[in-house]
């Protein structure tokens, strides 16, 4: 198995600087496709590095990029494009994808980051390869017709001890091409409670998209 190359840096998005971390397959191996990892309000791209998710994804042949959302982590100086709990125009995440040259990515979106990812997911002509919502906020702000139009494959993930997970699932289940991973005994950041189950389920889902 080839090694993994890691780097970090900053991109300019709509006039603001956003920090990112990236892991790639080593040895000049071409990545299969890109995975963009977002995060919740108490977390940052460092969460995915410490958990080993970036490394595991790169090891499996994917380009894994985690950003720090505006106002959080090492993007603290950047101003959020909308108040917490309000939907951010899809153009914001489109600009992130463009700045990082990701191509059509899979987006992993826990909790707070739903305000960024859901408009991007449901935008007309969305270029998402896949979507992995982990109990995201704002699921009630998307209408049934917009959910029904989504063509991307979706893996809905949540912990069975997380009321928000069940609430968000009631909306997300309207996505036509979805499967569900419920983690027993896990809370809101279920990927932290059950990292092995998280990585196994995620890699299995990605394998099916290849």
From Swiss-Prot:
InterPro entries: AB_hydrolase_1 (IPR000073), AB_hydrolase_fold (IPR029058). GO terms for biological process: positive regulation of transcription by RNA polymerase II. The keyword Metal-binding does not apply. Its EC number is 2.3.1.-. Keywords: Acyltransferase, Cytoplasm, Nucleus, Phosphoprotein, Transferase. Its main location: cytoplasm. It is an enzyme of class 2 (transferase). The modification Phosphoserine is found at residue 91. The keyword Cytoplasm applies. One of its GO terms (cellular component) is nucleoplasm. It catalyses: L-lysyl-[protein] + acetyl-CoA = N(6)-acetyl-L-lysyl-[protein] + CoA + H(+). Belongs to the AB hydrolase superfamily. ABHD14 family. This is Putative protein-lysine deacylase ABHD14B.
């Amino acid at each position: 198995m080839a090694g993994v190359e890691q780097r970090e840096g900053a991109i300019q998005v709509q006039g603001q600087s956003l920090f990112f971390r990236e892991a790639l397959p080593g040895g000049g191996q071409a990545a299969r496709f890109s995975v963009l990892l977002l995060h919740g309000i108490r977390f940052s791209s460092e969460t995915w590095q410490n958990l080993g998710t970036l490394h595991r994804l790169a090891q499996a042949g994917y380009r894994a990029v985690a950003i720090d959302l505006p106002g959080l982590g090492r993007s603290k100086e950047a101003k959020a494009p909308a108040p917490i709990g309000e939907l951010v125009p899809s153009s914001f995440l489109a600009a992130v994808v463009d700045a990082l040259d990701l191509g059509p990515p899979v987006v992993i979106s826990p909790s707070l980051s739903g305000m960024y990812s859901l408009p991007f997911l449901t935008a007309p002509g969305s270029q998402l390869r896949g979507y992995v919502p982990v109990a995201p906020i704002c699921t009630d702000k998307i209408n049934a017709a917009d959910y029904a139009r989504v063509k991307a494959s979706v893996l809905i993930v949540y912990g069975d001890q997380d009321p928000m997970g069940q609430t968000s699932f009631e909306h997300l289940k309207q996505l036509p091409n979805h499967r569900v991973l419920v983690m027993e005994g896990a809370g809101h950041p279920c990927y932290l409670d059950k990292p092995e189950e998280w990585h196994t389920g995620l890699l299995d889902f990605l394998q099916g998209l290849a």
